[in-house]
UniProtKB/Swiss-Prot annotation:
Residues 859-871 have a biased composition (Gly residues). It is a peripheral membrane protein. It comes from Alkalilimnicola ehrlichii (strain ATCC BAA-1101 / DSM 17681 / MLHE-1). The lineage of its organism: Bacteria, Pseudomonadati, Pseudomonadota, Gammaproteobacteria, Chromatiales. May bind 1 zinc ion per subunit. Monomer and homodimer. Part of the essential Sec protein translocation apparatus which comprises SecA, SecYEG and auxiliary proteins SecDF-YajC and YidC. This is Protein translocase subunit SecA. InterPro entries: Helicase_ATP-bd, Helicase_C-like, P-loop_NTPase, SEC_C_motif, SecA, SecA_CS, SecA_DEAD, SecA_motor_DEAD. The gene is secA. The keyword Membrane applies. Residues 834-909 are annotated as: Disordered. Part of the Sec protein translocase complex. Interacts with the SecYEG preprotein conducting channel. Has a central role in coupling the hydrolysis of ATP to the transfer of proteins into and across the cell membrane, serving both as a receptor for the preprotein-SecB complex and as an ATP-driven molecular motor driving the stepwise translocation of polypeptide chains across the membrane. CDD domains: DEXDc_SecA (cd17928), SF2_C_secA (cd18803). Belongs to the SecA family.
Length: 909
């Protein structure tokens, strides 16, 4: 209560922040007459003047008023669009590295030009991140006209470009691209075999469009570069025959082979099911008599069984995926769009392929991966913009250190958001929706009906056809018609059914899309024809406004309030009238899982008839609380994943830094010499423990190991027989001397220059191979670590401890393999070096995936394509290496061991 009174008296924190920025707007506006008076050349010359001032030490904050005034004037001259005062506030929020929440139709794309122009003056590059390639190309071409007018260069990165094209795009002052492409380019750069193969510059400043989609919804889905792993697809087909014979357990402790946890999107085998499955597997010849499913040798069976069980019980055709051209195409849960080329990981995609009877593509082994959370936290300054961020403000702050500021609208919003109507059954709900649509169509009101799945959109379309109501359907199956359907969605009486595809980034103009109509006329259209089209559009526009504007109908509440708000946001843009209402039933997923009992009891107490609905703010609150529960659960999952991924990320930073140093070094012989010395020393210590007596020595074992692992045939026993004075220290020195002599002989034969090249090539190849194997081992560790909880151990602490031990082991193994290879191999000429390089360059076999990640707690982090959040969060700033910075030898090692870098991962170099 006191908080509410204080807000009324003093205003909210958001209001106070906006007021402070409004003072800066006055300074920008005061410069407008002076800037308007400049010629085009004088305006363009300001860019170079600003750059010189930055080089002389002026900060971007100092330049902001004048730079914003210049960008606004350039936009007015080039595009005929002048930034409103509220858009200037949005630009300042982006410059400060915050998230600007701006409502639909408020011109987010134009707002970004202000901060982009200002930061491009630093010459360090600006990345503008969009959700798809179409928007990246469109915005680069559209807004690029402003930047090019002001003398700045613009690039765009999209899949399929050559290395030279990508490099040129990243060298530009401003680079547009998708989150996927920026992330994949980072991974590819860290797999490059030559310094000139890398394309990205430092990660200085980025503006993320639709920031909630990228940093929240997609945070559970890592980017993965993978290569094929040899594994038979037959096991998936055998499991897909077994799973339909299993029975679901409907109630706790009831009969059944498995039960579903729909909240966590996981399937679990019961005790009874365990026995039944073993019998079925034995009948299929997959399990020996007397063997247990959970024997160590049968881990692969458990993996395939779990994947098949999830595929059959939790993933539905036309909801979670489509079958197109004999392939499984994932449907994004949050956008409703098909995502060809994206695959679920951990065998789930293959299990769905087996279920649908389409060709099973081979599983892949991870070569490199990163989450969006850890990729975007590498930028020195990160900003974002979206129409719906306020509900996730805590997560943005907690994970990324990003503050959310709501920007006021240019015109007041007058949309009427009506309370939800809740029915007992889905049939009653759809009857009411059809009635509402009929009324709107008769009164010239356009209607947008939002559904949560392709299946629901087709079901509603069937009902509308039966009622003889003309309509358009927009879902992942007919996405190629999207532009035409959206252009006509604002016509008087138009009815459009759409999945979440229409919820984000689509602009429905009342009366239809005038620009699209004018574009259809062609360049040779007469002035009279153009004026006629404009008059017709104005008449339609006025009719729709008089009828009440666009009416948005939601057929089901989404797990996230943001997605619902995005759907509502299609109506009431730029001060237009409009309305929205959600129709729900107790059979809807959200209510069934989270709020069904309470709502059902309420309906029974009210003695409701068939077809009656509850309409009450209290009901809306119950539903909102259910959504809050899901959002809190999803946040916990994302936070949990991040805690685990941060361990892998620390290791990734160490490996990638070492790799960069290797790549940039012309001569790695000092590193190789140190490694050889360390490895030979540790091998000797294995067989001749320091400080031990002669009887404890295993000289024969040492001889054998030196020959088999390093190609060194040393007669150690003969030396000892011939020289009684040889003790541990002198024997050690003699072995080292022989090893060095052997290696120098190799150098004389091959030539120093050839051997230096070969050393570098071998080190890179072994580093990549051991890192790949380490990633696979880390994946296996993650999958089973939650079981430590049953032993009263903290899975996170156990994971950190074991992951660190595995990392240390990997580094030791890497050194031993490099030294062994270099000692054994015969380098004949430069062709050998080229052969190693060619083998390493096999980029063609790689796949680039934005793959489903599972929760590391053993609870399912995800069903479909993504859910998420990205973060600049609780990691201490000292541990966050700026891109490419070298760790000091005496600094704490970033892998988290607590040791100094030189005594830990720095040993590698």
């Amino acid at each position: 209560m006191f908080s509410a009174i204080a807000k009324k008296v003093f205003g909210t924190r958001n209001d106070r922040a906006v007021k402070r920025l409004a003072k800066e707007v006055e300074r920008i506006n005061a410069l407008e007459p002076e800037i308007e008076a400049l010629s085009d050349d004088q305006l363009r010359a300001r860019t170079e003047a600003f750059r010189e001032q930055v080089e002389q030490g002026r900060t971007l904050d100092d330049l902001l008023p004048e730079a914003f005034a210049v960008a606004r004037e350039a936009s007015r001259r080039v595009l005929g669009m002048r930034h409103f005062d509220v858009q200037l506030i949005g630009g300042m929020v982006l410059h400060q590295g915050k998230i600007a929440e701006m409502k639909t139709g408020e011109g987010k794309t134009l707002v970004a030009t202000l901060a982009v122009y200002l930061h491009a003056l630093s010459g360090r590059g600006v990345h503008v991140v969009t959700v798809n390639d179409y928007l990246a190309r469109r915005d680069a071409a559209w807004m690029g006209r402003i930047y090019e007018f002001l003398g700045l260069s613009v690039g765009v990165v999209v899949p399929g470009q050559s290395r030279e094209e990508k490099k040129a795009a990243y060298e530009a002052d401003i680079t547009y691209g998708t989150n996927n492409e920026f992330g994949f380019d980072y991974l590819r750069d860290n797999m490059a075999f030559r310094p000139e193969d890398r394309v990205q510059r430092e990660l200085a400043y980025a503006i993320v469009d639709e920031v909630d989609s990228i940093l929240i919804d997609e945070a559970r889905t890592p980017l993965i570069i993978s290569g094929p792993a040899e594994q038979s697809s037959e096991l998936y087909q055998q499991m897909t025959r077994i799973v339909p014979r299993l029975q679901r357990q409907e109630e706790e402790d009831g009969p059944g082979d498995y039960y579903l946890d729909e909240k966590a999107r996981q399937a679990h085998i019961t005790e009874e099911g365990h026995e039944n499955i073993e019998r079925l597997l034995q009948a299929e010849g997959l399990l020996e008599e007397g063997e247990s499913l959970y024997d160590a040798r049968n881990i692969s069976l458990v993996h395939h069984l779990n994947a098949a069980l999830r595929a059959h019980t939790l993933f539905q055709k036309d909801v979670n995926y489509l079958v197109q051209d004999n392939k499984i195409v994932i449907v994004d849960e949050f956008t409703g769009r098909a995502m060809p080329g994206r695959r679920w990981s951990e065998g789930l995609h293959q299990a769905v392929e087996a279920k649908e009877g389409v060709p099973i593509q081979s599983e892949n082994q991870t070569l490199a991966s990163i989450t969006f959370q850890n990729y975007f936290r590498m930028y020195e300054l990160l900003a974002g913009m979206t129409g719906t961020a306020d509900t996730e403000a805590f997560e943005f702050q907690h994970i990324y250190g990003l503050e959310v500021l709501s920007i006021p609208t240019h015109k007041p919003m007058i949309r009427d958001d009506m309370t939800d109507l809740v029915y007992r059954t889905a049939r009653e709900k759809y009857d009411a929706i059809i009635e509402d649509i009929q009324w709107c169509a008769q009164h010239d009101r356009p209607v947008l009906v939002g559904t949560t799945s392709i299946e629901a959109s087709e079901l509603l379309s069937k009902a509308l056809r039966k009622a003889k109501i003309p309509h358009n359907v927009l879902n992942a199956k007919n996405h190629e018609q999207e532009a035409g359907i959206i252009a006509n969605a604002g016509l008087p009486g138009a009815v459009t059914i759409a999945t979440n595809m229409a919820g984000r980034g689509t602009d429905i103009v009342l009366g239809g899309n005038l620009e699209a109509e004018l574009a259809e006329l062609g360049e040779d259209a007469s002035e009279e024809k153009i004026e006629q089209v404009k008059r017709d559009w104005q008449a339609r526009h006025d009719r729709v406004i008089e009828a009440g504007g666009l009416h948005v109908i939601g057929t089901e509440r989404h797990e996230s309030r943001r997605i619902d708000n995005q759907l509502r946001g299609r109506a009431g843009r730029q001060g237009d009238p409009g309305s929205s209402r959600f129709y729900l039933s107790l059979e809807d997923s959200l209510l069934r899982i989270f709020a069904s009992e309470r709502m059902s009891g309420m309906m029974q107490r009210l003695g409701m008839e068939e077809g009656e609905a509850i309409e009450s703010p209290m009901v809306s609150r119950v539903i909102e609380n259910a959504q809050r529960k899901v959002e809190a659960y999803n946040f916990d999952v994302r936070k949990h994943l991040l805690d685990f991924d941060d361990v892998a990320n620390d290791q990734r930073r160490v490996i990638y830094q070492q790799r960069r140093e290797l790549l940039e070094a012309d001569d790695v012989s000092e590193t190789v010499d140190a490694m050889r010395n360390d490895v030979i020393d540790s091998v000797i210590s294995e067989f001749i423990p320091p400080g031990s007596i002669d009887e404890q020595w295993d000289v024969a074992g040492l001889e054998e190991t030196l020959e088999s692992d390093f190609g060194l045939k040393l007669p150690l026993r003969q030396w000892l027989d011939e020289d009684d004075s040889l003790h541990e220290e002198t024997l050690r020195e003699r072995i080292h001397h022989e090893v060095e002599a052997h290696y120098r002989g190799k150098e004389e034969l091959a030539g120093a220059e050839v051997l230096r090249q070969f050393e570098k090539a071998v080190m890179l190849q072994v580093l990549d191979k051991t890192w790949k194997d380490h990633l696979a081992a880390m994946d296996y560790l993650r999958q089973g670590i939650h079981l430590r909880g049953y032993a009263q151990r903290n899975p996170k602490q156990e994971f950190k401890r074991e992951a660190f031990a595995m990392f240390q082991e990997m580094l030791e193994g890497l050194k031993r393999e490099v030294v062994g290879l270099l000692c054994r191999v015969r380098v004949r000429a430069e062709e050998d070096v080229e052969a190693v390089e060619e083998q390493r360059r096999r980029q063609g076999d790689m796949q680039y995936r934005h793959a489903q990640a599972n929760s590391l707690s053993g609870q399912g982090a995800g069903g479909e394509g993504a859910a998420g959040g990205t973060a600049r969060g609780p990691v201490q700033q000292a541990d966050q290496l700026p891109f490419g910075r070298k760790v000091g030898r005496n600094e704490p090692c970033p892998c988290g061991s607590g040791k100094k870098y030189k005594q830990c991962c720095g040993k590698l170099s």
